[in-house]
């Protein structure tokens, strides 16, 4: 089954890292990724740019509004995601644990099963 592993963190913490700290964290996370790539389980991985570059489109009262940044007023923001093919939720949680152990910050990892739909096909 495919799972999305969504990476959340306080953007003010991660943006304060020095270049060296950021490179070290990325290197440690890459080591975790390699293990799952070699097992044929890891799909696309993305690191999102800061929320200051984001826009949110919201439909309200018959109007479409575009706002700068994310809509959620929260300390933790979605900073990246992984797609992983695992036999069980427990296996996907093990992957998230490995990521968490490689990342010294206080962020969180949300693991969510995926339902895939092919373009032009409706789910049954």
UniProtKB/Swiss-Prot annotation:
Where would you find the membrane-spanning parts of this chain?
Answer: none
Signal peptide annotation = none
Q: Which Pfam families match?
A: YCII (PF03795)
Q: Which domain of life is it from?
A: Bacteria
Instruction: State the InterPro entries in the record.
Output: Dimeric_a/b-barrel (IPR011008), YCII (IPR005545)
- State the similarity comment: Belongs to the YciI family.
Q: What is this protein called?
A: Uncharacterized protein R00369
């Amino acid at each position: 089954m495919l799972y999305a592993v969504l990476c959340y963190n306080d953007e003010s913490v991660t943006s304060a890292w020095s270049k060296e700290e950021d490179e070290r964290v990325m290197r440690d996370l890459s080591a975790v990724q390699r293990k799952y790539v070699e097992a044929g389980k890891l799909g696309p991985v993305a690191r999102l740019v800061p929320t200051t570059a984001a826009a949110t489109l919201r439909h309200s009262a018959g109007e479409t509004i575009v706002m700068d940044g994310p809509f959620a007023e929260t300390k933790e923001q979605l900073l990246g995601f992984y797609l992983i093919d695992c036999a069980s939720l427990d296996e996907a949680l093990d992957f998230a644990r490995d990521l968490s152990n490689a990342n010294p910050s206080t962020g969180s990892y949300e693991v969510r099963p995926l339902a895939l739909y092919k373009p032009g096909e409706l789910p049954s």
